[in-house]
Amino acid sequence: MSDSLRIIFAGTPDFAARHLAALLSTQHHIVGVLTPPDKPAGRGKKLTINPVKELALTNNIPVYQPTSLKPEENHEWIKALQPDVMIVVAYGMILPKAVLDIPRLGCLNVHGSLLPKWRGAAPIQRALWAGDTETGVTIMQMDVGLDTGDMLYKASCPITHQDTSASLYAKLAELGPKALINTLDLIISGELKAEKQDDSLANYAEKLSKEEAKINWSLSAQQIERCIRAFNPWPMSFFMLDDQPVKVWEAQVIASDNTNQIPGTLLKADKTGIYIVTGEGILNITKLQPSGKKPMASADFLNSKRDWFTPGKIIQ
């Protein structure tokens, strides 16, 4: 097999663009890029190009932006490029079997978990929320299922008690490109060994919703604190205070026997934070963001809104 593969790259966000950038520094030939149509963004709703398209145009790579890959006529662009392999990273569209079968070596996906754990749309956030101590990336041979294909390569990293989705995303954005290039090297050398997934060990990382981000004080302080880190930077955990949403950026778990207190009860608010009773333990909110304001230390917020935080008040 030639040392240089003809690659079509399919992706959208910065996470994907980092993988494309890594491939551009190799001996492989990126013959085309698939990415979704430009979307309106900002107040003016101007059409904006995503990071993958921007990188492709900078490097004079042909770009194709179909609204769907289901129509057969949309497959002709892919066929004409005669790819050895298609690499898919956070593309955001379904690839039908007819597309998966076009490249000589099929389609590879970079998935942000250690499969078969956390198949689905939000593996980074769900791993954090669940309290996992380890995650990573899996390079997978795509099939028609949802992240069910054979595993080709894995790279892992620890999840710390300080990690947010943003910091974990950054870790995986470092791991993924290296794992992908190693996988391609193994394919070329003929040393790659595929491993089937054990479906009995699989679980699903469902897409996040804004509704989930509202803090449920009946959960334990530990669960809520993990949720706060998992939902940072989107959609951001929040609570309601005098009918205003307040986003929570940072919090601490305080062990306490508070079984006689209603979850959501405000215990105290001082320069060290805002202490709220949960289903188990106390949550100390140390950094928050009132509606229409920038994130700030809780102590700074209290300077102007101390009257909002009367001990005994129930926080919604």
Curated annotation (Swiss-Prot):
GO MF term (any one): methionyl-tRNA formyltransferase activity
GO cellular component term, pick one: cytosol
Q: Where does (6S)-5,6,7,8-tetrahydrofolate bind?
A: S113, L114, L115, P116
Q: Which UniProt keywords apply?
A: Protein biosynthesis, Transferase
Q: Which domain of life does the UniProt lineage start with?
A: Bacteria
**What catalytic reaction does the record list?**
L-methionyl-tRNA(fMet) + (6R)-10-formyltetrahydrofolate = N-formyl-L-methionyl-tRNA(fMet) + (6S)-5,6,7,8-tetrahydrofolate + H(+)
One Pfam family, short name: Formyl_trans_C
The catalytic activity of this protein is classed by the Enzyme Commission as 2.1.2.9
Q: What class of enzyme is it?
A: transferase
Transmembrane region(s)? none
Purpose of the protein? Attaches a formyl group to the free amino group of methionyl-tRNA(fMet). The formyl group appears to play a dual role in the initiator identity of N-formylmethionyl-tRNA by promoting its recognition by IF2 and preventing the misappropriation of this tRNA by the elongation apparatus.
Entry similarity comment: Belongs to the Fmt family.
Q: Spell out the protein name for this chain.
A: Methionyl-tRNA formyltransferase
* Species name: Proteus mirabilis (strain HI4320)
Q: What is the lineage of its organism?
A: Bacteria, Pseudomonadati, Pseudomonadota, Gammaproteobacteria, Enterobacterales
